[in-house]
Amino acid sequence: EANGNKATTPAIFPTHTEAFAEVVKKMTTGDGKVIDDVSEINAIGHRVVHGGEKFQASCLITPEVIETLRELSPLAPLHNPAGILGIEAAKKVFGDIPNVAVFDTAFHSTMPPKAFMYAIPYEYYEKYGVRRYGFHGTSHKYVSYRAAEYLEEPIDRLKLITCHLGNGSSIAAVD
């Protein structure tokens, strides 16, 4: 939806690149037009499900970041490889426009070891990265900050329980 106009296109795209090409077409022509050219886009954001312990904040996507995401794919085999395809397609379609990775696990990266370690041999953590990471962090962060706004309290003075209900569900204690 843009400028009060809603445009839908029921379609199946065989590749991320074809889907992005259609998005560009919709944004630059017809009823859904919101820009004249993709050069008007400042940046493209990508939700990345798993940043492991490597990424505690959003970052510009570089070839090194993509390689690290590939290395982290065993931690999220259904999500990270597809996310990488989306990133590569965006780079192909949108050219030099900066791409930014926003990590779902980043919100939970401040958990202390007593909260993220499992009662299993420590070598599993060292060798395989087995630990609690926390998921749906972008959702939990948003809800936490909205709750603080609604309650008219600084976020750092609140202790909250947030719930994410979607295709996946999670509950987080926010301190």
Where are these regions (language model features)?
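Short glycine-rich, Thr/Ser-proximal phosphate-binding strand/loop in the N-terminal lobe
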Residues: E1-P14
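Short glycine/proline- and acidic residue-enriched helix-loop micro-motifs
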Residues: T8-T9, T68-S73, G129-V130
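Electropositive phosphate-/nucleotide-binding environments in soluble metabolic enzymes
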Residues: F13-T17, A21, C59, P63, ...
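Short, well-ordered amphipathic alpha-helical segments that serve as non-catalytic structural scaffolds
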Residues: E18-D31, V143-R146
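Short beta-strand-loop/turn "lid" adjacent to the catalytic site in phosphate-handling enzymes
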Residues: M27, K33-H79, V100, A106-A115
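Alpha-helix termini
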Residues: D31-I35, Y150-E153
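Phosphate-binding/catalytic loop of phosphoryl-transfer enzymes
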Residues: N80-D175
